Design a protein with these regions (language model features):
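Hydrophobic faces of well-ordered beta-strands that scaffold small-molecule active sites
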Residues: 17-22, 45-47, 74-77, 96-98, ...
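Glycine-enriched alpha-helix->loop->beta-strand junction motifs that scaffold or abut catalytic
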Residues: 38-43, 89-96, 111-117, 131-136, ...
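Histidine/lysine/aspartate-rich catalytic loop segments that bind and position anionic ligands
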Residues: 99-145
Length: 218
């Protein structure tokens, strides 16, 4: 089961608002990436349920985190069903991320006091997610709507916590634009891991990025 309550996870995500979104079928490689993210200063990591052996890899990563990266929150992404949510929660998922919003997954997370991050795009979808209890809503895909959309959404919904994924680049310019538009958290996938084979370079890149993010006005 999760090591942290839903409220504790939400607080941590807002304090460490850069979330890597990652999947790889090779456990050893996934461990190296997770360790590099940890060494670079990240404390929230989303492993996605996108491969046939995702559960096995996730389970081994969870053990690795508890032994080597105890302050890292490890969550599972790309969850569509309550059955999958329950399975990964049982394996220790600290949070559950969806590309969509389903009441069944919301209920499974809430029953276990596990943070639930549903996916939405339209104003109506964001509102419906909050009505189901979401404290942080994922806007996806970000590259389709752009930062201008976030600014517009903030007009009628100034208080909803938002995380954007898809199209966020690991550059000062990109993250400054998104945070300036009003997001609370950014998720980064393939853009962050383009040269991931060089883990020392990845650590340095993440460290510099986190220093910049922490310098932005809150």
């Amino acid at each position: 089961m999760a090591r942290f309550s839903s409220a504790e996870v939400l607080d941590a995500v807002l304090r460490y608002p850069v979330v890597p979104v990652f999947y790889h079928a090779d456990v050893a490689y996934a461990k190296r990436i997770l360790q590099a993210c940890y060494d670079g200063g990240l404390r929230v990591f989303e492993f996605t349920n996108r491969g046939a052996n995702a559960f096995d890899v996730f389970s081994q990563l969870q053990t690795f985190v508890q032994e080597q990266c105890p302050d890292m929150l490890l969550g599972i992404g790309t969850i569509y069903t309550a059955q999958d949510a329950e399975r990964f929660i049982e394996a220790g998922a600290d949070f559950v991320v969806q590309p969509v919003t389903t009441a069944e997954v919301a209920a499974a997370c809430q029953h276990n006091d596990v943070a639930w991050l549903p996916g939405a795009m339209t104003l109506n979808e964001v509102y419906n997610a909050t009505q189901l209890g979401a404290k942080l809503v994922k806007i996806f895909p970000g590259n389709v709507v752009g930062p201008g959309y976030i600014k517009a959404l903030r007009g009628p919904m100034p208080n909803v916590k938002l995380m954007v994924t898809g199209g966020v680049e690991p550059t000062n310019e990109s993250v400054s634009e998104w945070f300036g538009a009003g997001v609370n958290v950014v998720g980064m996938g393939s853009q962050l891991f383009k040269n991931a084979d060089d883990t020392q370079a990845l650590v340095a890149q993440i460290s510099g990025l986190m220093q910049f993010v922490n310098s932005l006005p809150k």
